[in-house]
């Protein structure tokens, strides 16, 4: 990408999709939550016309790092918390039994810096960056930078403390 940050490979039209992409994620909406509008396809012929296509990158794990003014204020890892009948096991969201948890998760310094850089590049003071880690390539990839992450519990307290600290 233009900023030099590691994102999953992406494009905006079907015609741009490289032949070597074995699985393609189609994102029907760029504004949403919980995986709304995401479908995964194995051939370009069955693709809907959408705003964004990405290569499906296999993940060892997924995490969310919350950044405020250039520093991490919270971090979570996505865990399967309940079994449900999944339509597509490649999509990890609340509907398929996956949620962000703390579980004493300590993020890798590389992922923290990538999240800091992502928030800075998009020009935000704060944001929650969703990342995946691929063990085979020993690589983190940015999935998205959330400008209005769901805030509750400890995460909400961490944001409140960050904002109060910034005012003092």
Regions from the language model: what does each represent?
Residues 107-125:
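Short, internal acidic amphipathic alpha-helical interface segments
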């Amino acid at each position: 990408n233009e900023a030099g940050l590691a994102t999953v490979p992406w494009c905006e039209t079907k015609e741009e999709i490289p032949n070597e992409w074995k699985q393609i994620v189609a994102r029907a909406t760029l504004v949403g939550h919980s995986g709304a509008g995401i479908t995964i396809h194995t051939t370009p012929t069955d693709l809907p016309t959408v705003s964004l296509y990405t290569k499906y990158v296999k993940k060892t794990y997924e995490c969310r790092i919350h950044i405020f003014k250039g520093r991490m204020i919270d971090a979570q890892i996505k865990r399967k918390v309940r079994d449900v009948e999944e339509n597509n096991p490649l999509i990890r969201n609340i509907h398929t039994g996956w949620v962000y948890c703390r579980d004493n998760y300590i993020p890798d310094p590389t992922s923290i810096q990538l999240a800091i850089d992502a928030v800075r590049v998009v020009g935000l003071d704060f944001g929650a960056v969703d990342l995946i880690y691929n063990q085979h390539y020993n690589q983190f990839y940015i999935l998205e930078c959330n400008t209005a992450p769901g805030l509750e519990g400890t995460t909400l307290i961490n944001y409140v403390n960050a904002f109060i600290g910034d005012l003092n």
